[in-house]
Amino acid sequence: FAIGAIIKKFGKKLVEYAVKHKDLYAPYIKKHLCEKL
C-alpha cells in the first residue's frame, strides 16, 4: 500500500499522538537503536 498517502492523511495526528505518548515508546526505541549499534 501507499505509505506516503497514509502519512499525508494521518501524519499530523500521528505526530501529535507520538509527541503525547513518547514516554511509552522512547525507551524501546533507545534499546532497539543501541542493539543495532
UniProtKB/Swiss-Prot annotation:
* Keyword set includes Lipoprotein: no
Which tissues does the record link to its expression? Expressed by the venom gland.
Report the GO terms under cellular component. Answer: extracellular region; membrane; other organism cell membrane
The record's keywords, sorted A to Z, are: Disulfide bond, Membrane, Secreted, Target cell membrane, Target membrane, Toxin
Q: What is its main location?
A: secreted
List the GO molecular function terms. toxin activity
Localization, UniProt: Secreted; Target cell membrane
Q: How does it assemble?
A: Heterodimer of subunits A and B; disulfide-linked.
> What family does this chain come from, according to its entry?
Belongs to the ectatomin family. Ectatomin-Eq subfamily.
* Name this polypeptide is given: U1-ectatotoxin-Eb1a subunit B
- Record the organism: Ectatomma brunneum
